[in-house]
Amino acid sequence: RRYDLDILRILLTVLVVLGHASYYTINTKFGGIHYDQILSDMMIQDAGVHKATSLLTEWIYSFHMPAYFCLSGAVFSLELKKNRYSSVSKLIREKAKRLLIPLLFVWFVWNIPIKMLAGYYDGLAHPLMMAVIQIIFPNAVYLWFLEALFFCFIMDYVIEKHIKNVGQQFIIVGTLALIGLGFYKYARQIVPFGNPFRWLIWFWTGHFIDDILNELSKTSENHGFKSKKRAFVAESFLFALLYEISFCTASVKWILINTVMPFVGIIWIWTFARIIESALKEEHHKKLLAISQNTYGVYLWAEPLNYLVLSCVMKWFGISVFGTEMGAALIYIVRVVGTVVISVLITNMLRKIRCPIKAY
């Protein structure tokens, strides 16, 4: 078993939870929340804690979703080598069962009801209808990932089966990435199914990530970096430098965050996962696997609870608590710890009752 992939899955899930725990504002055509605007209207200054966690989220978002797609592509590459999918129809059936059915289940029994309670759809003439339509246009809804991932599996399968030349494959996924980035920049609110064109290139990169890392490891050794840890430090400096450069201008930032930054971030966090794996003893593998098996459930069930936490704090304590350092810190901690605990409980309950819908 590839324990480095389990570790990577855990690390990325942690980053997702941390990233989701900082937002005060979500704007979509289908609803949203506007706590930043309320703070501004009440002339309450944002807390330093929230500013810091927002910066952390911005850094996380510079690479963690491309890394997620790359991880999925790496696992898919291993499956293809074992001839797991004999046809595209079999692939569609299996991935629909694993991705789309859980998506719809969670969307209707969890995402919509919780957001209704939290006021996400307030002000809409037809909130339920808009909530259903939003499935097709899931911009700023965390479940967009499953939609985009489903189509990435299909597109990648077709490319891998019918085009053997890697250069030609790169031209195709690169062209689709440019189209997807155009959609993202100019029409993100109306791009359907999570904009899979934008993410396919990172999924496809998963086929080659081991070779890339192994080659970089050899190059690092030739330049005096005799251990993964030293290479990791060098990668960290490069990552930090690129992130600093990205603040030069908005255009430079946009280009870097959609091209170089994700690639460097993928290399960085993958190396980190390998360092952790090399430090683990064999008796830790069972615990590692148990944690890894909960990551999908955390992804599915945790995020909507953020809306409920914010809504409850607003109703019980008022907007002023958002502007205090202690209040902002406690809100963030509850959003991180509370959402994970509840989602793990739900995941284990569904696993225990053997729920036929694999939303865990």
Regions found by a protein language model. Give the residues of each.
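Alpha-helical transmembrane segments and their immediate juxtamembrane cytosolic regions
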Residues: 1-360
